[in-house]
Amino acid sequence: MAELDKDLIGKEFVHFKGGHYRLVGYAKDSETLEPMCVYEALYGEGGLWVRPAKMFFEDVEKPGYSGPRFKVVEG
């Protein structure tokens, strides 16, 4: 697995659409070994989600928004 920043585990992130999440940790896809982010929703009923790390940390280009998909919540 590529080096992923372990200091980000436990941090709160905000999705560009507004939801808040906590990064629980990193995992590997069992078939492809692709690095994945495991994260928990901090709203509603919560729940765990998995997304490829490349996608979690990428910038997105959407109508009205250009920037990171998830940003660390500072403070």
Which residue ranges define each predicted feature?
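Mixed-charge, low-complexity intrinsically disordered regions
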Residues: 1-75
